[in-house]
Amino acid sequence: MHFIEKEPPQKRIDFDEKLKSNKILRVPGAYNPLTAKLIEEIGYDAVYVSGGVMANDLGFPDIGLTTLQDVSTRSYLISRVTNLPTIVDIDTGFKSCKETIETFEQFGISAVHLEDQIERKRCGHLDNKELISTDAMVKKIQECVSAKKDKNFKIIARSDAKSVEGIDKMIERCKAYIDAGAEIVFPEALSDEKDFEKVRKELSCYLLANMTEFGKSKLFNYKELEQLGYNIVIYPVTTQRLAMKNVEDGLRDIYANGHQNNIIDKMQTRKRLYELVDYEKYNSLDEKIYNFSTEGHE
């Protein structure tokens, strides 16, 4: 029980309605369900599940080693704890686009994005990527569109072609992807304002901007992206990077000093954690569950 009010069809309707507004949607990545709850509490528009983050969390590099089961199971666990729509990175489609779309739709996801790299893919902000043909990607998109049952389930086409074939060829690909049924385009690894402006000028669909750190793209304020005409901005790896840096620093401090007294102020308190997991609400099941005070646990 997660005390969630909205069922998946309503989340998809919400996502569709948000896209039709004139406001850009701000969408951080969640690497676990608890992070998704925090994203909703703070007031963001949706939750994103990154394929790279899923791979990293399993101890793998982002080179296509995760399976449909790996990503769909984690995505389901994330999406079921929030009233927000969830967008999932499905990499290159996990061999069967039909099975992949059916799985993610059944698991309550609102949108997925599919990329045009070869199966042994890599992070979109690395060099020497290899692409499948435009025709092959078009067929994948068509298979995705045909497989979905809910008209509000969104197919997002990601193109990694800019750094391989140039921005003009990437735009040509994206136009073909739109014609194939993609409602949103994700032009990966754009460099600067000129790139973002050019893509917006040439494409008439909804556009997604990727503001990942340590990559090829300039990091814009969301208001700048909104002015450039973009509809969604994702922060795919941000929460994992924040968490892992803090965990590493804390573990090193404990190892060096033999105690955690120096880093208590960097930790989430017991009281705050219990607020985030709705501990008190579980008294609706049994009044003995939350029969204590968190005073002094700040």
Placement of each model-derived feature along the sequence:
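Conserved alpha/beta catalytic core and glycan-binding cleft of carbohydrate-active enzymes
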Residues: 235-298
